[in-house]
């Protein structure tokens, strides 16, 4: 009788934000599971349920049984904007504006393996997954609060003396692209398996900002949403004992965001300046990628190397917005 395994992993991982942990594309995120943050390589994984997203074909190489895994990734972030002490003849207070709002990124993975086939399901955050909150505004709100001769709304907000020094500002934003994947894999030979499936992406972005001056105030809220399907394919090859190679192709996800906007600035000036006036559409795809991973035991069962490469196909995506 084959050994049956039920693996249930619930991981709460608290990490500091570093560039390596957030590695990905312009929009894509690679930190889809806690085990990726722990190892920084999962493209050839055949050991845990998150193989469903990193190496879907490799799920057919796992031992028979049910594998389940739930992750909650808590990322501590510290972003800052350094402001100038002056813009031309206009003196500013300068200094640094900070946001230390953490990000909470969930992940859910399930794999069922039987004989030569497997089925899997996962919920991940393949894009976005972040939140910022600048209680005193940031560089953008500072520029928007400049006096009218400098191209801002400072005169409207604060009267003749209105400028960033005497206008209260704040801005916050969050973005989550939730991906739901369903697929399967089949072991053609003992050394080769193929897999694939479909992914549904529900993308959401929200931006909220406000400014208060002696004369007027401005409130802006922008929600951008869209949803789409894409597909993925995978191959897993184990040519010799202790060596495994995983290959995954994720197709481009076409997203055409629609803006739902409330803007009290004169003539909707703020939302129009970024191209997100109410009802407007903007293509901003979630690019596809090719992931390759190698896992090799130098010393069987003791020492293993796992080089990984993920190449994002951003040239094939349509990105109309300025990034």
Protein language model regions, located:
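Short intrinsically disordered, low-complexity coil segments enriched in acidic
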Residues: 1, 6-7, 89-94, 272, ...
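Short, intrinsically disordered low-complexity segments
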Residues: 1-3, 68, 198, 240
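Cleavable N-terminal export/targeting peptides
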Residues: 1-30
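Preference for bulky hydrophobic residues occupying beta-strand positions
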Residues: 15, 70-72, 198, 307
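Hydrophobic alpha-helical membrane context
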Residues: 15-16, 67, 211
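N-terminal, post-signal peptide beta-strand-biased segments of exported outer-membrane/organellar beta-barrel
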Residues: 19-127
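Outer-membrane beta-barrel porins/channels
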Residues: 24-38, 42, 47, 105-107, ...
